[in-house]
C-alpha cells in the first residue's frame, strides 16, 4: 500500500512537470520604451479611465453614442458571441458530473403457442470520467479563457464604435464649418466679380481679369456642391454605424466643442490593463496554452467509472414477479495505442498555435504603443498648427484688404488680389481641419488607452 502511494505521488509530480495541470501565467512584462521619450508619462493617471459621457459632453453626440450602443449590429453580434462562450463554459463544467440515462426495455415472447411471457428491464445508467490526467480541467480552463476573450472582444468593439461615432460626428461638424466658409466666400467672390466688371467698364482692368474672376466663382460654387455631397455621404455612413437607415443627423457646431482633458496616458501597464484588444489577445494566448496542455493529456489513459441500477424480472432463464433490484458497476482505463502519431501531430499543431498567439499578443502591444504615440503626436501638432494658423489668417485678411484697396485705385494687378483671396480661403479651411485634428487626436488617444468601457 505504501509503495502504491509513493508511486502515485511520483506520477503526479511527473504530470505536473509535463505542464498538464499548470495554470497560465499572465504576461507581466512589456517592451521597453513603449512611449517615445518626448511623450513619456509622468504620472499614473490615464484619460482611458474616464467615462465616455464625461469626455463627450455634447448632448447630440451623447444621444448618437447611446443609439449606436443599442443598435449597432457588430456590437450586438459581439454580445451574442459572449453568450455562446458562456454556454460553452457551462458545457465544460457539466463534464465533471456523471452522465445519467434511462433505458427501459420490455419483451414479450411465446414458444410453441405456450402462454406468453413478459420480461422487463428499467435500468438507470451512470457514467463518470475521473479527471486524473487533466483533460477536463484544461478543457474548462480553455473555455473560461474563451469566455474572457469574447468579453474583451465585445468591449473592444464597443470602444471602437464609440470612437468611430465621435470621429464621424466631428467630421460632420468640420464639413459644416467648411461649407459655411466656402459659401460665404462664394458670396464675396460674386461681389468681387461685380467690382471687376465695373472696373473693366471704367477701363481700369481687362476682360481677362473678369473671365478669371468668373472662373474662380464657378470653382468655389463647385466646391460648395462637393461639400454638400460629402456631408450627405458622411451622414449616411454615421446612420449605418448606428444601425439605422440613412437620415439627417442632428448636431451642434464645431466652435462649441470642448475636449480639454489632461492628455495623460498613464504607465504602460495601465494601458495594457485598459485596452480590450490587448486583453483579448492575451486571453487568446491563454486559450492556446490550455489547448497545448489538452493535447499533452491525450497521451495518458482515461479512467471512466460506470454503473447501473434498476428493476428487472429477468434472471437469466428465470422470470420472477415482482421484479428485483439489479445493480452493476464497471471501471475502465483506456490507454491510446495506435493513435500516438495523431496525438503527436495534434501536439505540434497546439504548440504552433500557442506560439502564433504569443506573437499576436506581442504585436498587439506594439500596435497599442504606436497608436498612443500617434495620437499624442497628432494632438501636439494640431495645437501648434492652430496657433500658427490664427496668425496666418490675420495676416492674410490684412493682405486681402490691402490688395483690394490698391486695385480699386489702380495701384496693383488683379492677380495679386486673386492670389491673396485664394490663399485666405485655403488657410481658413485648413484652420477648420486643424481644429478637427485636435478633436480627433483626443478621441484616438481615448480609444488607444482603452476608453469607452463604461
Question: Which residues fall in each region the model found?
Answer:
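Regulatory alphaC helix of protein kinase catalytic domains
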Residues: 39-67
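A short glycine-centered flexible hinge/capping loop motif at secondary-structure junctions
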Residues: 200-204, 407-411, 448-452
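Short terminal targeting/anchoring segments
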Residues: 208, 411-433
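A small-residue-enriched
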Residues: 18-36, 66-131, 233-249, 262, ...
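Sec/SRP-type N-terminal targeting helices
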Residues: 76-77, 93-94, 130-158, 208, ...
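Acidic, low-complexity, intrinsically disordered peripheral segments
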Residues: 7, 19, 23, 259, ...
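Periplasmic alpha-helical coiled-coil/stalk elements that build and connect Gram-negative outer-membrane
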Residues: 145, 152-267, 378, 382, ...
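Sec-dependent bacterial lipoprotein signal peptides
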Residues: 1-16
